[in-house]
Amino acid sequence: MTRIPSSDITDQRFYLNRRAFIASALAAAGASAFVNPELHAQQPAAHGRKLATVKSPLSGSETPNKWEHLTTYNNFYEFGTSKSDPAVNARGFKPREPWTIAIEGECARRGTITLEDVLKGQTLEDRIYRHRCVEGWSMVIPWVGFPLASLIKRCEPTSKAAFVEFTTLLDRRQMPGQESDVLQWPYVEGLRMDEAMHPLTILAVGLYGETLPNQNGAPLRLVVPWKYGFKGIKSIVKVRFLAKQPVSSWQLAWPQAYGFYANVNPAVQHPRHSQAMEARLPSLFQTMRTLPFNGYGDQVASLYAGMDLRRNY
């Protein structure tokens, strides 16, 4: 993983939707630093059950964001579109027990499996990864999880399986954001098979050595550290193996802004803003240059050899 030199960290204004407007106003008044207020608007999540883990050699060495940052500033539209909504609206979410995952499509072992069964004999790993949101902010997150490849191998995909599609739980009673029309529900995401099998790609079940809080995607979510955060689908209930590329939820909603690959790329800007810089939360003023593939290019760039990454964004 590419390290970010201190010379790449700058102290300049960073515009991030309506929250950045507040920051820029303070800067004009002479403020030298600004902490995003939504990071402190809610009580952090209660701590979960401790998990037995081992440190992965693929884990990064950067200092993770604090628990309160990670559990009060979230994109989880099933619980609302504001960053503080999930911390409030997911409090009463009760993941069904047993949590089941439907396995469908081009594989030999179709059916329904429980998360408990998936985790039997599975070594849970601590993985400190960078997290880069398409909105222009970033964090460092200490996930607990296991390689997605281990689940895929268990499903025995056929030679026709070129893609993996994931689906989030549809439960409007518990997930009030699904009453809105901001997206078509349930949320759907996908990966090319080689991306899904890559050692960096994990299914996360925890955070900071504990079970995953509701607002972070409990009980099971996808983590692909070289892609923008919207690829990290949460509360997964279905995995489907496909011969053709699936259409993800954000692709369907706004294809000019959200591509299937969603690799972090400072050279390809979002229609509303540049992707060249990012704000490392909790500060909106601690900004740094965004690295191709979020700094994981040494490990993953070969997956896209010969591809036009401006076109295949």
Where on the chain are the PLM-derived regions?
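N-terminal secretory signal peptides
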Residues: 1-16, 20, 27-31, 39-42
